[in-house]
């Protein structure tokens, strides 16, 4: 039997950064039933974090902390990503103009795909995160669109909502590519050299995109293995991403 405490750092994190279902519906301006339909159609992600007395904490990225397989049970308390509000609003607007739920979901995915492809063309760091999308200086369109479909599916399944403050084609490419750049440097500084100033700058750009991650996830997540690691390696203090890190509630 698992118990939740309002003083639990994980509870404080989730309630600081994520919304209950009714708040998300209210932010979009739709009913709970309509939001259920949008989620079921794949217009955006469902629950991102959940807690149940049976299995404890769960996230869409890594499942249950206690190793239990499967989704959270029906009685679990659930929290949703504020970032999802934009896609659900866009889908609601499409429905008002006559689109079906399925068409609204396709329109959201198509917009993401176009943003993703444009970001690959424009961002120099994209080659770190999506090298398979390039042939020399050219984008391989079919590969880029396949990768876009995979990344969109990861958003709808909830994984990216653990990571990103806002999800667009550009923020997806930037997050994956900046993270891969830092990981490559950490793994092999000789092959992927960065000055201290350059490493710090990339960390800052990545931090602008990312949520802190729940306390149980951060050490092994992208912020922990890149930003936290390099800030410490550079002797430039320590990241304090959570309420209470300063010893106060």
Describe the predicted segments one by one.
Residues 15-35:
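Polyanion-binding surface elements
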Residues 31-65:
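Major-groove DNA-recognition helix of helix-turn-helix-type DNA-binding domains
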Residues 11-13, 49, 55, 160:
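Sequence-level detector for tyrosine residue identity
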Residues 54-249:
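Long, charge-rich, low-complexity intrinsically disordered regions
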Residues 5-16:
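Short, amphipathic alpha-helical "recognition" segments used to contact nucleic acids or chromatin
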């Amino acid at each position: 039997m698992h118990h939740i405490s309002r003083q639990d750092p994980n509870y404080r994190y989730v309630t600081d950064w994520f919304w209950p279902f009714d708040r998300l519906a209210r932010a979009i301006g739709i009913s709970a039933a309509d939001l259920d339909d949008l989620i079921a159609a794949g217009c955006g992600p469902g629950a991102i974090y959940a807690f149940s007395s049976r299995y404890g904490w769960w996230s869409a990225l890594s499942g249950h902390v206690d190793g239990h397989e499967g989704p959270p049970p029906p009685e679990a308390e659930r929290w949703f990503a504020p970032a999802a509000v934009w896609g659900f609003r866009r889908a609601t607007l499409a429905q008002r103009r006559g689109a079906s739920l399925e068409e609204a979901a396709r329109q959201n995915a198509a917009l993401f795909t176009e943003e993703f492809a444009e970001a690959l063309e424009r961002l120099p760091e994209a080659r770190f995160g999506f090298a398979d999308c390039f042939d020399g200086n050219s984008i391989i369109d079919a590969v880029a669109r396949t990768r876009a479909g995979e990344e969109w599916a990861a958003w709808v399944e909830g994984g990216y909502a653990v990571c990103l403050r806002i999800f667009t084609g550009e923020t997806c490419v930037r997050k994956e590519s900046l993270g891969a750049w830092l990981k490559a440097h950490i793994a092999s500084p000789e092959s992927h050299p960065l000055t201290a100033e350059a490493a710090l700058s990339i960390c800052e750009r990545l931090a602008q995109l990312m949520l802190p991650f729940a306390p149980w996830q951060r050490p092994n997540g992208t912020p922990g293995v890149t930003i936290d690691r390099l800030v410490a390696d550079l002797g430039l203090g320590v990241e304090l991403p959570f309420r209470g890190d300063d010893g106060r509630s």
